[in-house]
Amino acid sequence: MKVDKYILGVCSGAHIMPPVAAMISGRTGSVSTRAWFPAEHTGFQGHFPGNALLPGFLHIELVLDILRDHFKEVELTAVQSAKYILPILPDQIVDVNINIALVGGIAAQLQVAGVAVSVLALTVSGIAGAPDQKS
């Protein structure tokens, strides 16, 4: 598997592929990409020994880190809902689909093999006007 970048921040060590699709116009749009958390990722340590799964907060951080690739100053202000349907296990490929609505509303779904593993509704700051593209 070719890995094009390593995400920084809390999700350090996760491998994020280039966006499959990114359609952002002003403050709305969508981003779809893939991520992979190797078995050695620190998120799996202690959660749970012998039965590793990615902690729920890292599902949220993954979405935020992907958004930060498109908007410089994205910060989480509220978790409206977070539904964890199935665990993300070590070495699984995770499809991440993010929809950006007006006034900071974010809807995200994480999937493994086409099956939803988490559904998130977040409120963020830092998405005002056109995106500040990072180089």
Residue ranges and their predicted role:
Residues 63-99, 107, 123, 127:
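Hydrophobic beta-strand-centered segment that forms part of the acyl-chain substrate-binding groove
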Residues 37, 41, 88, 100:
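A broadly conserved detector of short glycine/acidic/proline-rich loop/turn motifs that flank catalytic sites
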Residues 2-3, 77:
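Long, low-complexity, compositionally biased intrinsically disordered regions
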Residues 19-22, 28, 99-135:
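HotDog/MaoC-like acyl-thioester-processing domains
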Residues 9-54:
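Catalytic strand-loop segment that frames the active site of acyl-thioester-processing enzymes
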Residues 53-66:
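Active-site beta-strand/loop microenvironment that shapes enzyme catalytic pockets
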Residues 4-14, 26-29, 84, 88, ...:
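A glycine-rich (often HGG/GG-containing) alpha/beta subdomain
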